[in-house]
Amino acid sequence: MKVTLIAILTCAAVLVLHTTAAEELEESQLMEVGMPDTELEAVDEERLFECSVSCEIEKEGNKDCKKKKCKGGWKCKFNMCVKV
């Protein structure tokens, strides 16, 4: 009788630990889904900076500012890459 009770309690404990670990894994995977948004924001900032710096460098060289072409649905306007 004691062995059966110990076996049942052990199985219950393992089940609880397994369920908790599965929930934590699911939460961490859900958090990772949001990460590309942050990466996209960083890319947007890089495009904005890249375009304005490119024009400033060309102006200093006594040349007309040829705006750097922005790719992927972006357009260079007023020394900044803007979403088209």
From Swiss-Prot:
Its main location: secreted. It holds the Pfam family Toxin_20. Residues 1-22 form the signal peptide. It comes from the Eukaryota. Disulfide bonds join 51-65, 55-76, 70-81. Residues 23-47 form a propeptide. GO terms for cellular component: extracellular region; host cell postsynaptic membrane. The keyword Disulfide bond applies. Keywords: Disulfide bond, Neurotoxin, Postsynaptic neurotoxin, Secreted, Signal, Toxin. The keyword Signal applies. GO terms for molecular function: toxin activity. It is found in: Secreted. Expressed by the venom gland. Belongs to the neurotoxin 12 (Hwtx-2) family. 02 (Hwtx-2) subfamily. Postsynaptic neurotoxin. This is U4-theraphotoxin-Hhn1a. The lineage of its organism: Eukaryota, Metazoa, Ecdysozoa, Arthropoda, Chelicerata.
